[in-house]
Design a protein with these regions (language model features):
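N-terminal pre-domain segments of enzymes
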Residues: 22-74
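N-terminal cap/lid segment of alpha/beta-hydrolase-fold proteins
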Residues: 60, 68, 73-130
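Cap/lid segment of the alpha/beta-hydrolase catalytic domain
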Residues: 128-215, 219, 239, 259-264
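Short beta-strand immediately N-terminal to the catalytic nucleophile in serine-hydrolase-like folds
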Residues: 223-225, 249
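Gly/Ala-rich beta-loop-alpha elbow adjacent to hydrolase catalytic centers
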Residues: 225-229, 233
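Mobile cap/lid helix-loop segments that gate and shape the active-site cleft of serine hydrolases
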Residues: 245-293, 314-322
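Conserved strand-to-loop "acid loop" that flanks and positions the catalytic carboxylate
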Residues: 298-300, 304-313
């Protein structure tokens, strides 16, 4: 991955300015989810998308199909502010401050433990009264989790939380469940059907936190990520329309192009186990795919930088999607 990719991504960030598909229904294999012209691609007699209401029907069906696999996004109507504490504070050059924070994403009750996420938050001591755009920065599959985008290890060209902060943004780099400081037992937390939905929930609480900060313009929020962080950006941005710009560095391809259609890599507890248990790792049965998800981000901005020799996320599937 070359540094210029994130330079372009930064330029993009500066702009911050279907009925459910059942397994017994007929489908055209990999073509169904790539067809964005129809209100319902399985039943084209319903007609093509002619207006915004038609597209909303299609987007609603995409979300329903996504939640069949990931589990439903819990109700967020009575959450209240995010409680957090500062664990460490480190001054950096040019008036930048790196704070290691911890915040509650799930309150405990008689049936489950409270869950807390640690993250690195970059803010500015100079012109501290200015409300700045903010970016949620999601890490790749790496043991140190949030430490890589924060510039504390890993690949130098993936220190995007630090780099974007140096360019004037407020940035937040949280741990994905089971990475970094976020020890997490997926099987012991049965309220989540997938690690993907748990991560989406945590990320949305991160957006809540950012919007409440006096240093942040709550109407200018973006999200960026590499690999795991790339598709995590897409998933989170699909559910959270407060994210106005989504930037991915690899992280997706058509399911039929992922290891020639072998979806085992998507099925661990960290991701979507139902792809294996309910859909036999068969991309022709999984009721959603990335062309729909990325289309569902419209009219918000989306940028991707995808390598042409990626073994995981095969580039022709990216081209099919875009």
């Amino acid at each position: 991955m070359k540094r210029f990719a994130f330079t372009v991504a930064t330029a993009i960030l500066m702009s911050l300015a279907l009925p459910i598909l059942g397994q017994d229904q007929p489908r055209e294999l990999d073509q169904v989810h790539a067809n964005l012209d129809w209100v319902d691609p399985v039943s084209p007699e319903i007609g093509t998308i002619q207006n915004l209401d038609d597209w909303k029907r299609r987007r609603d069906s995409i979300r329903k199909n996504l939640e069949i696999v990931m589990g439903s996004l819990p109700d967020r109507s009575n959450l209240g502010p995010v409680a957090f504490e500062v664990l460490e504070e480190t001054p950096l050059p040019d008036g930048l401050i790196r704070r290691k924070i911890q915040y509650i994403t799930e309150k405990g009750d008689a049936h489950r433990k409270e869950d807390r996420v640690q993250a690195y938050l970059f803010v500015h001591s100079q012109n501290a009264n200015i409300r700045r755009p903010a970016v949620l920065c999601l890490h790749q599959t790496i043991g140190i989790g949030k430490g890589e985008p924060a510039g504390l290890g890993g690949s130098k060209n993936l220190h995007y939380a630090l780099e974007l902060a140096q360019r004037g943004y407020v940035t937040l780099a949280p741990d994905y469940p089971s990475f970094g400081d976020h020890e997490y037992d997926f099987r012991a937390n049965s309220q989540w059907a997938s690690g993907s939905m748990k991560a989406i929930w945590d990320n949305m609480r991160g957006i809540d936190l950012l919007q409440d900060l006096p240093q942040v313009d709550p109407k200018r929020i973006g999200c960026i990520g590499h690999s795991l962080g790339g598709h995590n950006t897409i998933f989170t941005s699909f559910f959270d329309e407060r994210i106005l710009v989504a930037v991915t560095s690899c992280g997706f391809t058509r399911f039929h192009k992922y290891y020639s259609g072998n979806l085992q890599g998507w099925t661990s507890d960290r991701y979507m186990p139902r792809i294996a248990t309910n859909y036999a790792n068969n991309p022709s049965l999984v009721p959603f795919d990335f062309p729909e998800l990325i289309a569902g981000l419209a009219p918000r901005a989306f940028f991707t930088s995808s390598p042409i020799r990626d073994d995981n996320f095969e580039v022709s599937g990216v081209r099919d999607t875009i």
